């Protein structure tokens, strides 16, 4: 009763909700419905940090080559990811491919022991630009590859240059016919199980902006409803926090 009364007394634009990393789609849908129909607010966000994402096309945030497809890839490029720690099953498939086919694996930056050898190239935006402009040795390898697999990790999506890196690399793959109905070389490796479902339901700021996260940082909300969200990093002032969850407790202690 106290919670419902507090919500009723607060302006809708001063209420925000955040989806946690293990929230199922049914709960996400219910949360979205609750915010739209009851609270009359669009302040529902699934990201806890500023990640670039373009949800206009679903393939922009999927692992399009598929986990099984990794095994037939003839060139694997890792950009901003360590699959050994971020996706162990995926990493085992990459290792299986290497052991069977000696597939060439390239990583932008040294990410440590992945249990298979890989070539390390400079980890910066200039490298991406050189590849796109056909000025890097990797460019020709991508063109010659029949089933290339380019894997973007979340760390690269946090960069200020993320829009350029993602959109231009995607366009490069399209121009070179590496994105088609038969094979899609573009892959996003999401760390959280709820990410794809949240994007499918469009649970993020308008136009994929950082509006809600910016307002959170600036303490513009009076009520925060956390649906199992335990990863928010902000300096709490007078926000009234409602925590709904079972898998973690950090959010409950805010």
Give short role names for the model-derived ranges.
Residues 1-254:
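Catalytic alpha/large subunits of respiratory electron-transfer oxidoreductases
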